[in-house]
Regions:
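S-adenosyl-L-methionine-dependent methyltransferase catalytic core, i.e., the SAM/SAH-binding region
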Residues: 1-226
Length: 226
């Protein structure tokens, strides 16, 4: 599809080159992987899965192009078993997509001004802004220390708790600037690494329950593979 070149395209095409039957693209995203596989292999039928509402429009293009070999379900890959089928292959390309990063209004990027959101599905759950204002200290520690692997997590959590007592963050750049002020070691020890990198990653993983879905998804994958 125009505007997006999948990073893992060649490796994925090689992996599934001789696969016949049904394949689940559990992280449809921009649809680049599904499109490339459908073009390469006429013996493959693909079901794309994604909870991002914007993926629906991109999926409709493939539906028109491959009406008998492609379909789409707006569910998380952890819900594969709800389809009631078995599959010959399952593809998962985890993390945030370039479509989501490039759209500042989605709130995934700390380099562009946008609402502090980060939800894979903006219609459900807490946004990053809401999470930052309401999460307990332990929830913040889990997100920033465990999921983000931020070495200065103590300082970050302490300052978040203090700041939110009388203030709140509204945008990505506002929060990124806040992190820049409270992670000064990056400037001397990690030149070129933005101080918001790990914290944004941790928040995204936390509010989307990415590891929880991965655990359920892997179990479901083993249960549904032929």
């Amino acid at each position: 599809m125009e505007g997006h070149i999948p990073v893992l395209k060649d490796a994925i095409l090689t992996t599934f080159k001789n696969l016949t039957g049904f394949l689940i693209d559990g992280t449809f995203g921009g649809g680049g992987h599904s499109e490339a596989l459908l073009e390469q292999n006429n013996n493959l039928t693909i079901i794309g899965l994604d909870i991002d509402p914007e993926a629906i429009n991109r999926a409709s293009i493939l539906k028109e192009k491959y009406p008998k070999r492609f379909s789409f379900e707006a569910i998380n890959f952890s819900q594969i078993e709800s389809l009631g089928k078995t599959f010959d292959g399952i593809l998962l390309d985890l993390g945030v997509s370039s479509f989501q990063l490039d759209n500042a209004q989605r709130g995934f990027s700390f380099r562009n001004e946008g609402p502090l959101d980060m939800r894979m599905n903006p219609q459900k759950g807490l946004s990053a802004q809401q999470f930052l204002q309401t999460a307990s200290e332990n929830q913040l520690i889990q997100a920033i220390k465990e999921f983000g692997e931020e070495p200065q997590w103590r300082s970050v959590v302490k300052n978040i708790l203090a700041y939110r007592e009388t203030n709140e963050w509204a945008t990505t750049l506002q929060f990124a600037d806040f992190l820049d002020k409270h992670t000064s070691l990056y400037r001397s020890k990690k030149p070129g690494v933005h101080p918001a990198t790990r914290v944004f990653q941790g928040l995204r993983i936390a509010i989307n329950d990415e590891l929880g879905h991965l655990t359920k998804g892997l179990e479901a994958a083993f249960n549904t593979l032929k």
